[in-house]
């Protein structure tokens, strides 16, 4: 996890083990968000493309969606929805290839002059990574569950790191439609205060089996 020749908060590179977890193949879309909004009575949000990732979502919004989805899943099975940790997200982004810079390889893609210049693209417009996950490291920044600490890697546990116990900013991962490709690297870290909403911030649902139901 991390990149030794990356930015300061990506060092030191270190080996991490994560327990089995689930991660949605797609970023949460406007269509998904609209179902949540209708079910919970939230204010309607205008959007152009229902298959584009839901944006203008803060960390608390994303957590509320996960709690709602957990209740929906609880009616059908034994899964709990949640945001992924930074460690889980980076593991998933690499697609099974250790040390890979980007989900698709070690060089930036050529398509940086994108078709959609004023917002995120519909999901799954390009090939998935080795784990079948679409748009890892692109389209919108994705919220993680962790608090952010630039020096956390120096003290991070080797198994299932959850991030620091407290902080001011929440961690996010992945590149976005309006940011330089440097944020699209698997190891790149970003963060903002959890109450902030931006046009290039969304999320991807993670999950795990509920032990009591196994």
What feature does the model see in each segment?
Residues 2-6, 43-190, 194-199, 206, ...:
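Functional-site microenvironments in short loops/helix caps that host divalent-cation chemistry
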Residues 23-26, 160-162:
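Short, mixed-charge, low-aromatic patches
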């Amino acid at each position: 996890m991390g990149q030794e020749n990356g930015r300061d908060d990506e060092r030191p590179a270190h080996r991490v083990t994560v327990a089995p977890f689930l991660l949605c193949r797609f970023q949460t879309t406007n269509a998904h968000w609209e179902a949540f909004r209708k079910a919970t009575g939230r204010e309607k949000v205008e959007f152009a493309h229902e298959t584009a990732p839901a944006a203008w979502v803060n960390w608390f919004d994303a957590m509320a969606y996960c709690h709602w989805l957990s209740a929906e899943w609880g009616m059908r099975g034994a899964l709990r929805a949640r945001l992924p940790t930074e460690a889980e997200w980076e593991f998933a982004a690499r697609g099974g290839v250790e040390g890979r810079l980007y989900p698709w390889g070690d060089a930036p893609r050529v398509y940086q002059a994108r078709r959609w210049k004023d917002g995120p693209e519909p999901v799954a417009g390009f090939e998935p990574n080795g784990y079948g996950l679409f748009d890892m490291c692109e389209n919108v920044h994705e919220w993680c569950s962790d608090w952010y600490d630039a020096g956390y890697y120096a003290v991070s546990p080797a198994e299932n790191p959850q991030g620091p116990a407290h902080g001011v900013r929440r961690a996010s991962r992945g590149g976005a439609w309006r940011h330089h490709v440097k944020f699209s690297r698997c190891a790149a870290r970003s963060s903002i205060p959890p109450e902030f909403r931006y046009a290039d911030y969304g999320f991807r649902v993670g999950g795990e089996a509920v032990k009591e139901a196994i």
